[in-house]
Amino acid sequence: MISAIIEDIKAIKRNDPAARGLEVILYPTLHAMLFHRFICHPLYKIRLFFLARFFSQLSRFLTGLEIHPGAKIGPGFFCDHGMGVVIGETAVIGRNCVMFHGVTLGGTGKHKRKRHPTVGDNCFIGTHSTLLGPIRVGNGVKIGAESVIVNRDVPDHCTVVGAPAMIVKRGQRKVHPPEPLPFSSYRLDEVKRELGMVIEPDMVSDGGGI
């Protein structure tokens, strides 16, 4: 946990030219990570859910970042400004990710299994972007401000913008016209499972034929 916090401090210095010295210890993103890494997430893992939520709410009040205790966040996380950020329970964020204020990593549906985004390593998520559902955002992805992604995966090393977001760059190569994002592989598997549950009883009652 200490090594993760050290990486978080390095991320502040690396991504914000205004961070010149000891003032990094005043950044809300660092305070939020201290709460999450040392208190909220450990309490959640040992199933002390009320205490975990209590301290996450305290962190939200002090920092403006709403991070569910169940979220998994890799080292080197930096959230500039931070106000209005929402990170859901089953969200996963990789190493060295940067996001700005107003970003939502939200869920779809009311089931208790995976329902929030998984974000890869070295990603950038711009101001007021909304990512919903059990989607996969690949490594090295850049998401432009106010983009909206619902139940769509983002391939590695792509730049996406818009509502709905579309691919405008793959690596260093511009994409014209912009390409739509592929449907969420997790959601497709979920639909297949649900279809299987519907079809299977019929197959049994009909003697196996469709």
For each feature predicted by the language model, list its residue ranges.
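Structural signal for interior beta-strand "rungs" in well-ordered beta-sheet cores
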Residues: 60-161, 165-168
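Terminal amphipathic alpha-helical/low-complexity segments used for targeting or macromolecular assembly
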Residues: 1-59, 63, 174-210
